[in-house]
């Protein structure tokens, strides 16, 4: 928001963006809100990317082209990874329990 002083003697200024000519007053503060608006737009873009990350069919915000389904694939591999380790833990516990119940399994 740029302001040009048309006549400094009688305190008249013109807003370049709108072409409005008005009296300059000391009790009014003029603030440029364009940086704030840019920051709000950037935060809105991040919020939209976060919202899109909840749908596994969408690609991440700064991903290369053709990366649709990344979240779906990651979710599938995560389930397989944790499922494998949980199954292994249960298998070890069952094996230890079976050996303690029947010591003849290990030759004692």
From Swiss-Prot:
GO cellular component annotations of the record: plasma membrane
Substrates-to-products reaction catalysed: 5-methyl-5,6,7,8-tetrahydromethanopterin + coenzyme M + 2 Na(+)(in) = 5,6,7,8-tetrahydromethanopterin + methyl-coenzyme M + 2 Na(+)(out)
Xref: InterPro entries: MtrB_MeTrfase
Top-tier EC class: translocase
Pathway: One-carbon metabolism; methanogenesis from CO(2); methyl-coenzyme M from 5,10-methylene-5,6,7,8-tetrahydromethanopterin: step 2/2
Membrane topology note: Single-pass membrane protein
Subcellular location: Cell membrane
Keywords: Cell membrane, Membrane, Methanogenesis, Methyltransferase, One-carbon metabolism, Transferase, Translocase, Transmembrane, Transmembrane helix
Family membership: Belongs to the MtrB family.
Quaternary structure annotation from Swiss-Prot or TrEMBL: The complex is composed of 8 subunits; MtrA, MtrB, MtrC, MtrD, MtrE, MtrF, MtrG and MtrH.
E.C. code: 7.2.1.4
Pfam families in alphabetical order: MtrB (PF05440)
Descriptive protein name: Tetrahydromethanopterin S-methyltransferase subunit B
GO molecular function: tetrahydromethanopterin S-methyltransferase activity
Domain of life: Archaea
Transmembrane segments: 79-99
BP terms from Gene Ontology: methanogenesis, from carbon dioxide; methylation; one-carbon metabolic process
Functional description taken from the UniProt entry: Part of a complex that catalyzes the formation of methyl-coenzyme M and tetrahydromethanopterin from coenzyme M and methyl-tetrahydromethanopterin. This is an energy-conserving, sodium-ion translocating step.
Gene: mtrB
């Amino acid at each position: 928001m740029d302001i040009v002083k048309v006549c400094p003697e009688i305190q008249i200024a013109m807003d370049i963006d709108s072409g409005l000519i008005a009296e300059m007053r000391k009790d009014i503060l003029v603030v440029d809100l364009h940086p704030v608006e840019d920051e709000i737009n950037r935060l809105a873009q991040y919020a939209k990317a976060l919202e899109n990350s909840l749908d596994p069919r969408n690609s991440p915000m700064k991903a290369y082209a053709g990366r649709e389904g990344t979240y779906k694939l990651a979710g599938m591999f995560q389930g397989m990874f944790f499922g494998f380790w949980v199954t292994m833990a249960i298998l070890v516990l069952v094996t230890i329990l079976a050996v303690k119940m029947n010591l003849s399994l290990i030759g004692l």
